[in-house]
């Protein structure tokens, strides 16, 4: 089997050594080279043509954003950003520019703790050969040519349904490639749907609040990071908090969020399966589950639960998925109602809701 060739770009000598040590412990990986600033980094990427680049965003001579634009424009290569939690807004900018994923340093200023992210970075590196680089390049070009407009100011969401709808909730799960995909779906609507949307995106603690705030600015929905006790109501989008699972329960005639610590068997967090299964239990046949891009099989048990409760399930098509792992496993269950390219998912949701909501 061909080994995964990686170039490590980081201005911290300790961080470079730590990342190289992690990578060299993987028999399927070879570190082809490293660089301590952006200018040297782009030369190494062009000369060595690696399968993957790990990238620090804050560097001398050429910052990570400039380097990322050059890589995606001249020698498209999968890039994993390694970032401090304090740089959360920068991470989402990097994902928009074409980075495929990110790994969070455990805490700012404690380089030694970088060693604790070994499992996370190794898992993401192993998925490099399953990445859909054509779709990553296409999305990056679309964002550069036509960045999403700022959504019109929204009125405060009210806990009531103002238009009849065949669904109560749309539950979306995703992993690698998910943040730009979710942004694309939500920003496609010109008006909020008369249903709730709940989202579990595999993401560490410390990043989901910024993700929710970003989506809130770029869509007509009220989007927030879910907190325990939040009410689920039409027009509201709730994002599972990083490092925790989001489930639901009925309380005094409403449905509320319960934020739970992950169980030992939860490999992926926040768990898409846990969210989908809870939606099936609470919302029953008025649930639509959507499994987007991502590695692994999270979501496959959840779509079975939704179908068992009489609900509906969609999966993202291979043509648009950055990683087809999660959608493939959902489709393999045999219960998915339709396989849909990313750019048509918002329209499909609207049709299944049964409301004539305008789309861009």
Curated annotation (Swiss-Prot):
Q: Which residue intervals define the domain Response regulatory in the entry? A: 5-120
Q: Cell inner membrane: present as a keyword of the record? A: no
**Keyword annotations from UniProtKB, A to Z:** Chemotaxis, Cytoplasm, Hydrolase, Phosphoprotein
CC per GO annotation: cytoplasm
Give the disulfide map.
none
Pfam families xrefs: CheB_methylest (PF01339), Response_reg (PF00072)
Residues the record marks as active site: 175, 202, 298
EC numbers for this chain: 3.1.1.61, 3.5.1.44
List the subcellular locations: Cytoplasm
User: What highest taxon heads this organism's lineage?
Assistant: Bacteria
Residues recorded with modification 4-aspartylphosphate: 56
Q: Which family does it belong to?
A: Belongs to the CheB family.
Cross-referenced HAMAP family, in alphabetical order?
Answer: CheB_chemtxs
- What is this protein identified as? Protein-glutamate methylesterase/protein-glutamine glutaminase 2
What is the organism of origin for this protein? Answer: Geobacter metallireducens (strain ATCC 53774 / DSM 7210 / GS-15)
